[in-house]
Regions:
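A short helix->beta-strand "capping" segment at the edge of beta-propeller domains
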Residues: 25-46, 76-82
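Blade-loop segments of beta-propeller domains
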Residues: 78-133
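Short loop/turn segments that connect beta-strands within beta-propeller blades
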Residues: 74-79, 117-121, 157-160, 202-207, ...
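Exposed beta-strand face motif in extracellular beta-rich ectodomains
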Residues: 1-5
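Beta-rich, blade/repeat-based domains predominating
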Residues: 45-56, 89-99, 129-142, 172-186, ...
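A short beta-strand motif characteristic of beta-propeller blades
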Residues: 36-42, 80-87, 121-127, 164-173, ...
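Beta-strand-rich domains and repeat architectures in extracellular enzymes and scaffolds
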Residues: 38-72, 84-97, 134-135, 246-252
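Conserved beta-strand positions in repeat-built beta-propeller and related beta-rich domains
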Residues: 61-66, 104-110, 145-149, 190-194, ...
């Protein structure tokens, strides 16, 4: 990440200060991991997937595009949308997560988010933030948000105030375009926007410890005219299942990383 070093000295009774900015890289390159497909399921090919997480046997999915943004409950095996709420047409839906039996959903440039009842999808309250909203996930009693840069913001859930932030980097420098997030077994998994990569981040240091390339996941025969980028990570902790998909992808994949 970025750091600034400042030196102050006194000369002939005058104080002089010099500062210089430096950029810190990770000490070693990320481990390259592989994946295998465990299961393939249908996915709504008109769902512009922005956020995804597992809850009580279903996937909760946040979709984007103005006039098409939703929060929905999806049956995994069939891809059927069993419950849905539409956002106002002025909002572009983004990431979503569950914290203490409440669903948090971001919007892209409106700097406004929504909190829902996870059973009824009724709106409980709204919240505001100072950046764009991209991805969001839950780490114990903290929310972690991305804004498309290389920064992860750690937020207090009730007030949405910033507790701290880390800059994400690897051995080559900053890793930006952090998009959808999922907290899995002590690490933050992040989609890198406009790529088929997921990076695995140490949330304390911001260092990218590993990465997975999913370039060949979606077959050419499944790529229709409105297909968009790889995005969406969901983790079923109880059954140790990892799900990934993409925007307007016709399929959802259960994968294993090794």
């Amino acid at each position: 990440g970025s750091r600034r070093i400042r030196a102050t000295a006194w000369y002939n009774g005058e104080r002089q200060t010099v500062s210089v900015g430096i950029r810190i890289k990770a000490g070693k390159s990320p481990r390259t991991m592989n994946y295998r497909v465990v299961n393939t399921f249908p996915h709504d090919k008109e769902a512009y997937t922005q956020g995804l997480f597992y809850h009580n046997g279903y996937l909760i999915e946040s979709t984007g595009q103005k006039g098409m943004s939703t929060l929905r409950r999806v049956e995994i095996k069939t891809g059927k949308v069993v419950q849905s709420v539409n956002l106002d047409q002025n909002y572009f839906g983004e990431g979503a997560t569950l914290y203490k039996d409440e669903i948090y959903q971001l919007t892209w440039t409106s700097r406004k988010g929504f909190v829902y009842n996870p059973q009824t999808f009724s709106l409980i309250r709204t919240f505001e933030y100072l950046t764009q909203g991209w991805g969001i996930t839950t780490m114990q009693d903290t929310l972690i948000m991305s804004d498309g840069s290389n920064v992860l913001y750690f937020l207090e859930p009730k007030s949405f105030t910033e507790l701290r932030r880390v800059e994400v980097c690897d051995n080559n420098g900053p890793v930006s375009q952090l998009n959808e997030l999922e907290y899995i077994q002590g690490k933050v998994y992040a989609n890198i926007y406009q790529t088929d990569r997921i990076v695995i981040i140490n949330p304390a240091s911001g260092m990218v410890e590993a990465q997975v390339d999913f370039s060949n996941l979606l077959k050419l025969s499944d790529r229709h005219r409105n297909i968009d980028v790889f995005n969406g990570i969901a983790w079923d902790e109880e059954n140790q299942r990892l799900f990934v998909t993409g925007k307007n992808w016709p399929k959802l994949f259960q994968v294993e990383i090794f």
